Amino acid sequence: MLRTPRPVIPAKAGIFAFKGFAFAALSAICYGTNPLGALHLYAQNYSPETVLFYRFFTAALLLFVVILAKGSHFKISFREFGALVAFGFFFAVSSLTYYASFKYMDAGLASTLLFLYPLEVSVLMAVFFKEKIKTWTIVSIAVSMVGVALLYRGGDGVPLSTVGFMLVFASSISYAIYMVMANRIKLQMGSVKITFYAICFCLVFLLLYSVTLGSGLPPVFTQASSWGWGFMLGLVPTVLSLIFMVKAVKIIGSTPTAILGALEPVTAVTIGVLVFGEVLTGRLIAGILLILGSTVLIAAKRK
């Protein structure tokens, strides 16, 4: 029987694809380091809104330099202004509730629950844009709910904080809304520029929250370690994560990049266990794997 010869893949093409997967993995790992800086700053008695202010202020400065280095302009239209303000609002809500949840539950579990947002994107698209819900979407949602049930009791056997769970849910649904808006509102500008303006408007909303409902104006850091962790949060899980993601999408596309996003909560869980002594049991591992599996299925099926 004659066999169809396998296509020969040039070595350079294989190396190029490998770089794309490496960039996607690095993007996810970088984003998963959020708890590392946040929890160290919490230990120095800084509030979530203060930590986020320094994270995004640093990121905005770094992205400003990146845009200048690329020779891009900062001009935006009135329509783009309105969309970017909305992006900034949901970005602020998602970030604030996510960081606040670290006060009520292990950061690794919070990061895993945040990763439910791809499922929520599918539900939002079905409800508001009449996108058909396929069988694999229903299966993914059911599997993720089993995973959440397994996570209901933390590693020490104590039920998860209701406040913490609601904060993470608010964070994931806010991020899902942000993703749906970004998908439906086609802005004629690059990802770096969109993120720069979203972060700038996010800073405005964070300051409004701080002075009205939060801890007041962000205090000036007084320790070198505080500045170091603040800079780390602005650079690693924000700017580097974005740059690596953009490079990955250009090389291998959005679907493989989204699938490798599963490394985000894996990184956060690893940091929680190794650095902060968070407890990880067999039941929690099973719950985490079910949630990651369900969201990876969603990412793999969505085109």
Annotate each predicted stretch with a short phrase.
Residues 2-3, 52, 56, 153, ...:
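C-terminal-most transmembrane helix of multi-pass membrane proteins
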Residues 63, 85, 133-153, 172, ...:
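Hydrophobic transmembrane alpha-helices of multi-pass small-molecule transport proteins
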Residues 28, 54, 110-116, 181-204, ...:
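Helix-helix packing/entry segments at the starts of transmembrane helices
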Residues 1-29, 60-86, 127-138, 156-163, ...:
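Membrane-interface interhelical linkers
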Residues 62, 67, 98, 117-142, ...:
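C-terminal transmembrane-helix exit sites in multi-pass transporters
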Residues 30, 35, 67-108, 113-114, ...:
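Specific transmembrane alpha-helical segments of multi-pass solute transporters/efflux pumps
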Residues 2-50, 54, 89, 93, ...:
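Glycine-/small-residue-enriched transmembrane alpha-helix faces in small-molecule transporters
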Residues 36-48, 103, 152-161, 211-230, ...:
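Membrane-interface helix termini and inter-helical loops of multi-pass transporters
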